[in-house]
Amino acid sequence: MIQPQTLLNVADNSGARKLMCIRVIGAAGNQRYARIGDVIVAVIKDALPQMPLERSEVIRAVIVRTCKEFKCEDGIIIRYDDNAAVIIDQKGNPKGTRVFGAIAEELRGLNFTKIVSLAPEVL
């Protein structure tokens, strides 16, 4: 569960390394926490030099991994080692060209098929 002030890793090669959530905007209804597949507004806390994204830039991101376990539709419980997000643009397309780490299958049903196709492993 991601809430404002939560630090997240970046799971793509867009140039950012760490994000801090400042607002949950894509959750169902008016919820306080973001789960896998929800869109957040975040600020970049750490970035690589000479990359298009810079530190203290406000961006949108979709949550792809959380430490809080969640239950799949088939009854399997999945929990990841870290909180991670992929940076997206206003249309929902990823800014990076690669995605690192495992991605949840639930993103496919939420119209993030481009992120799922870039992922090396889908759980």
Curated annotation (Swiss-Prot):
<dbReference type="GO" id="GO:0070180">
    <property type="term" value="F:large ribosomal subunit rRNA binding"/>
</dbReference>
<dbReference type="InterPro" id="IPR019972">
    <property type="entry name" value="Ribosomal_uL14_CS"/>
</dbReference>
<dbReference type="InterPro" id="IPR000218">
    <property type="entry name" value="Ribosomal_uL14"/>
</dbReference>
<keyword id="KW-0689">Ribosomal protein</keyword>
<dbReference type="GO" id="GO:0022625">
    <property type="term" value="C:cytosolic large ribosomal subunit"/>
</dbReference>
<comment type="similarity">
    <text>Belongs to the universal ribosomal protein uL14 family.</text>
</comment>
<dbReference type="GO" id="GO:0003735">
    <property type="term" value="F:structural constituent of ribosome"/>
</dbReference>
<dbReference type="InterPro" id="IPR005745">
    <property type="entry name" value="Ribosomal_uL14_bac-type"/>
</dbReference>
<keyword id="KW-0699">rRNA-binding</keyword>
<keyword id="KW-0150">Chloroplast</keyword>
<dbReference type="InterPro" id="IPR036853">
    <property type="entry name" value="Ribosomal_uL14_sf"/>
</dbReference>
<comment type="function">
    <text>Binds to 23S rRNA.</text>
</comment>
<protein>
    <recommendedName>
        <fullName>Large ribosomal subunit protein uL14c</fullName>
    </recommendedName>
</protein>
<dbReference type="GO" id="GO:0009507">
    <property type="term" value="C:chloroplast"/>
</dbReference>
<dbReference type="Pfam" id="PF00238">
    <property type="entry name" value="Ribosomal_L14"/>
</dbReference>
<keyword id="KW-0687">Ribonucleoprotein</keyword>
<keyword id="KW-0694">RNA-binding</keyword>
<dbReference type="GO" id="GO:0006412">
    <property type="term" value="P:translation"/>
</dbReference>
<keyword id="KW-0934">Plastid</keyword>
<comment type="subunit">
    <text>Part of the 50S ribosomal subunit.</text>
</comment>
